[in-house]
From Swiss-Prot:
Gene name in the database record: talB
Entry's Gene Ontology molecular function annotations: transaldolase activity
Cellular localization per UniProt: Cytoplasm
Listed GO biological process terms: carbohydrate metabolic process; pentose-phosphate shunt
Organism: Escherichia coli O6:H1 (strain CFT073 / ATCC 700928 / UPEC)
Pathway named in the protein's UniProt entry: Carbohydrate degradation; pentose phosphate pathway; D-glyceraldehyde 3-phosphate and beta-D-fructose 6-phosphate from D-ribose 5-phosphate and D-xylulose 5-phosphate (non-oxidative stage): step 2/3
Reaction equations catalysed: D-sedoheptulose 7-phosphate + D-glyceraldehyde 3-phosphate = D-erythrose 4-phosphate + beta-D-fructose 6-phosphate
Catalytic residues in the record: K132
Name listed for the protein in its UniProt record: Transaldolase B
């Protein structure tokens, strides 16, 4: 009998949400995603020490300024981990721009190009890389420009429909709407504490975005992210891609039985609305208290982990 992970792969591209190379070898995903928190966790793994040492040595060759060395080594470490992962996945690696740049379009573009150059210098072409940016108005504008220059982007920390619409209209390659973090907010801020998978607010959000994109002929890939249980994952079978943490990949691989496709669109493609303006985007996003809270919290958390990573690097310089 087939297992649920194998069955899921019939309908959806499975991506590993981890920086752990051992997990890549075990579950053989198509792509992999990383973020500052995952890079920080990966940096604690003994096998990665050589990647850290290489990043530090490289940074020392680039500059004599300690602050610049820390920035350079942190960028190089993220790319070094990405390079190791790319040896194991046939598709793409997502590497994230510093979350502290989430409200600065030009700085985000510059950092993205810096990461791309590090990959290119290591022999990796742009078609194997996704640059991750937070789905702020400024991040979406940065992605729009990068896409025009042949740098594909993964827009993350996406919680509102306004964010999803703006990303599609900007022509970004891929979005990562968060499922589990939406569920977390509703459990913490409403009286309802238990949700069946089909009524899980995170699942409902991703389903609505998927239908809207297909209905209007947008090519932006929808990749559900941030799962709390396999029930959420199974309800999104058929989504373009799902990025899944190793613990849930393990649970799916160990669960027997075929699964059914839940997301699909066979209707006609409808005319697209006029592009959302900045003021419309900000107002519509602001009308969703969950999205406002979780976007801000997500940026803060990634920034904290970026700073922890920089402190760890600084101690080695």
């Amino acid at each position: 009998m087939t297992d649920k992970l194998t069955s899921l792969r019939q309908y959806t591209t499975v991506v590993a949400d981890t920086g752990d190379i051992a997990a890549m070898k075990l579950y053989q995903p198509q792509d992999a995603t990383t973020n500052p928190s995952l890079i920080l966790n990966a940096a604690q793994i003994p096998e990665y020490r050589k990647l850290i040492d290489d990043a530090v040595a490289w940074a020392k060759q680039q500059s004599n300024d300690r602050a610049q060395q820390i920035v350079d080594a942190t960028d190089k470490l993220a790319v070094n981990i990405g390079l190791e992962i790319l040896k194991l996945v046939p598709g793409r690696i997502s590497t994230e721009v510093d979350a502290r740049l989430s409200y600065d379009t030009e700085a985000s573009i510059a950092k993205a190009k810096r990461l791309i150059k590090l990959y290119n210098d290591a022999g990796i072409s742009n078609d194997r890389i996704l640059i991750k940016l937070a789905s702020t108005w400024q991040g979406i504008r940065a992605a729009e420009q990068l896409e025009k220059e042949g740098i594909n982007c993964n827009l993350t920390l996406l919680f509102s429909f306004a964010q999803a619409r703006a990303c599609a209209e900007a022509g970004v390659f891929l979005i990562s709407p968060f499922v589990g973090r939406i569920l977390d907010w509703y459990k913490a801020n409403t009286d309802k504490k238990e949700y069946a998978p089909a009524e899980d607010p995170g699942v409902v959000s991703v389903s609505e975005i998927y239908q809207y994109y297909k209905e209007h002929g947008y090519e932006t890939v929808v990749m559900g992210a941030s799962f709390r249980n396999i029930g959420e994952i199974l309800e999104l079978a058929g989504c373009d891609r799902l990025t899944i943490a190793p613990a849930l990949l393990k649970e799916l691989a160990e669960s027997e039985g075929a699964i059914e496709r839940k997301l699909s669109y066979t209707g006609e493609v409808k005319a697209r609305p006029a592009r959302i303006t900045e003021s419309e985007f900000l107002w519509q996003h602001n009308q969703d208290p969950m999205a406002v809270d979780k976007l801000a919290e997500g940026i803060r958390k990634f920034a904290v982990d970026q700073e922890k990573l920089e402190k760890m690097i600084g101690d080695l310089l």
